[in-house]
């Protein structure tokens, strides 16, 4: 009754108005699972390959009709008849059918859509919420949201090199309260920016994208917004950034707009250390470029005992890359993006390796998103403790937050908000008040 009976893909649009693929998996019992695939703007070079049509006469070459054809043709033929409860078998069939290291034959967007839709259909068939299907009865930790309220870099047309400035409402007792705190700070920040004459248009992920004098000014605005919203920076609300340093790394140098000459790795580390000394900054993602492994090692030596150092582009949700990073002392945390690796099984393998290696895990969206809220269930399913899914505007971001509200409500008294745990384990880093 849980065998896959049919698979159907269609081309839909993501939050940037670009095509992406949506897949429906129907079981012989009639249960249906649907999943839409996200897309990134700043991508790691080792990510599984997202295929596009390349036809400039249609969607400026970004169509995904070839991906749709792959799903409705060879992928469908290979997977129909497999029991949807056998997620590993489904995913391995997809991996073998593609036959490449980076899923470049069929496309990670084709494979991922089928993988996630299968999990959803299976959860429906056995009558479990998706997070519980993924993680069992132990799935009950609601994640701390890393809310991207100021956008820069590849996510916004302004002069900030750092791609994301985020707030983390660790002082809340529940996820519902954390979301409220974030929303209050977000709206306070808007009022402050507007009063100072800044445009309050938003970037890809729903955060503001002002032209500021410096990165320090961005941090200062965040601290001011937290305080004026009635919260304590450092104890109730911590800060996080995604530097996305690979975006401005060239010839082993970092080209920052606020410096006339590029920085080497050591200078870049000192630049980042300055922020940690001046502000309640607890988490730095992609502080150095994905190919600057020597620099990453030094960064980890300098800051790894004090704050969270998150690898995104350097690890790309790949267990092989993470294993190498663990061996070489690179970072202490990994960002989890399902479309970087391409199947749910490989994603879960990477998460398991991270936990065995005492690395923290942050489940993440992409800048090109849809209303699909799979990652909210994934974050609870694996007890990740942290989720990064944008700001407090744009319904493609809020879809994930709203799903987490539903999950917390469903779990009732067994729900555990991770904020106090995170705060306790990092209490010594952020005393700047």
From Swiss-Prot:
Cofactor note as given: Binds a second Mg(2+) ion via substrate during catalysis.
Residues at which Mg(2+) binds: 242, 285, 312
Cell location: Cytoplasm; Secreted; Cell surface
The protein's enzyme class: lyase
Pfam families, sorted: Enolase_C, Enolase_N
SMART domains with a match to the protein in the record: Enolase_C, Enolase_N
InterPro entries in alphabetical order: Enolase, Enolase-like_C_sf, Enolase-like_N, Enolase_C, Enolase_CS, Enolase_N
Main location: cytoplasm
Cofactor(s), names only, from the UniProt record: Mg(2+)
Gene3D superfamilies: Enolase-like C-terminal domain, Enolase-like, N-terminal domain
Role according to the record: Catalyzes the reversible conversion of 2-phosphoglycerate (2-PG) into phosphoenolpyruvate (PEP). It is essential for the degradation of carbohydrates via glycolysis.
HAMAP family xrefs: Enolase
Family: Belongs to the enolase family.
Protein name: Enolase
Gene name of this polypeptide: eno
């Amino acid at each position: 009754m849980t065998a896959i009976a049919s698979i159907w893909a269609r081309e839909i649009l993501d939050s940037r108005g670009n095509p992406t693929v949506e897949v429906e998996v129907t079981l012989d019992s009639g249960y249906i699972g649907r999943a839409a695939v996200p897309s990134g703007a700043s991508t790691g070079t080792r990510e599984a390959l997202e295929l596009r049509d390349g036809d400039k006469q249609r969607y400026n070459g970004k169509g995904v009709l070839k991906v749709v054809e792959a799903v409705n043709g060879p992928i469908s033929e290979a997977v129909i008849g497999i029991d949807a409860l056998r997620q590993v078998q489904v995913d391995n069939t997809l991996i073998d059918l593609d036959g490449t290291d980076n899923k470049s034959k069929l496309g990670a967007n084709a494979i991922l859509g089928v993988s996630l839709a299968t999990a959803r259909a299976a959860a429906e068939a056995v009558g479990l919420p998706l997070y519980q299907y993924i993680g069992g009865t132990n799935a009950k930790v609601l994640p701390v949201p890393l809310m991207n309220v100021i956008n820069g870099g590849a996510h916004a047309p302004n002069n900030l090199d750092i791609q994301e400035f985020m707030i983390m409402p660790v002082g809340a007792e529940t996820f519902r309260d954390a979301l409220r705190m974030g929303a209050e700070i977000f709206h306070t920040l808007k009022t402050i920016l507007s009063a100072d004459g800044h445009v309050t248009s938003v970037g890809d992920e729903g955060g503001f994208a002002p032209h500021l004098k410096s990165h320090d000014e961005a941090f200062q605005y965040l601290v001011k917004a937290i305080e004026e919203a009635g919260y304590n920076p450092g104890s109730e609300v911590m800060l996080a950034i995604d530097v996305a340093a690979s975006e401005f790394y060239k010839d082993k140098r970092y080209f920052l707009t606020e410096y006339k000459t590029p920085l080497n790795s050591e200078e870049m580390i000192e630049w980042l250390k300055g922020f940690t000394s001046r502000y309640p900054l607890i988490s730095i993602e992609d502080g150095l470029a994905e190919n600057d492994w020597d620099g990453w090692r030094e960064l980890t030596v300098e800051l790894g005992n004090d704050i969270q150092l998150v690898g995104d582009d350097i690890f790309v949700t790949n267990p092989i890359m993470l294993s190498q990073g663990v061996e070489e002392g690179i970072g202490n945390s990994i960002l989890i993006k399902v479309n970087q690796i391409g199947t749910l099984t490989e994603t879960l393998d990477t998460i398991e390796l991270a936990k065995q290696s005492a690395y923290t895990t942050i489940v993440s969206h992409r800048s090109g998103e849809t209303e699909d809220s799979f990652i909210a269930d994934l974050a609870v399913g694996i007890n990740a403790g942290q989720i990064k899914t944008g700001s407090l505007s744009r319904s493609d971001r809020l879809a994930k937050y709203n799903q987490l509200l539903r999950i917390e409500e469903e779990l009732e008294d067994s729900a555990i908000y991770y904020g106090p745990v995170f705060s306790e384990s990092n209490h010594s880093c952020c005393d700047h008040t």
